[in-house]
Amino acid sequence: MLRIGVLVSGGGTNLQAIIDGIDSGYIPDSSIELVISNKKNAYALTRATDANIETCIIGRKQFESPAAFDVALADTLKTAKIDLVLLAGFMAILGPGFFTDFKNKVMNVHPALIPSFSGPGYYGLKVHESVLAAGCKVTGASVHFVTPEVDAGPLILQLAVDVKQG
């Protein structure tokens, strides 16, 4: 059984898709053991609680430095014996210290075809606004392993979709 930890910051639609995928058997032999939010009012925490998944809040402002925040996240995941970490709308950048114990064990979904519209500053609606402003005919999503360099980790898969006009 793969023990999954999910890091969230917002509404949790990606988290809900993962929960539903596990519940339906589409994602086999896996369980979400812990959901951590860096935002105390994230609706993703409600989604996790409704699914009987343990939650906790670890906010960046609780710590003197980003490195201390990274260590707290990693220690919490290690204590829960997490095998794989999924970023599901997690709006914080993880530093090198986080990856000491989780190298090649952290995955993210980016709302564009990396390397386009990726890297620092490209997240959420900003990505989609940039795609539209550039007049792109095609966009998509990328799943990649997370590294200390933003959106630079090895690609796992990509899916392209046409941009509809209007």
Model-derived regions, located:
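N-terminal Rossmann-like dinucleotide-binding module
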Residues: M1-Y43
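A residue-level signal for conserved active-site and pocket-lining positions in enzyme catalytic cores
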Residues: G10, V35, A48, V85, ...
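A general structural signal for well-ordered alpha-helical segments in protein cores
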Residues: L15, A44-L45, D70, G124, ...
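Amphipathic, non-transmembrane alpha-helical secondary structure
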Residues: Q16-D20, T46, V71-K78
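Short, surface-exposed acidic-centric catalytic microdomains
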Residues: D29-A68
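Glycine/small-residue-rich loop that forms an oxyanion/phosphate-binding "nest" at active or ligand-binding sites
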Residues: K61-I82
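Donor/substrate-binding cores of folate-linked one-carbon enzymes
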Residues: L84, A88-G166
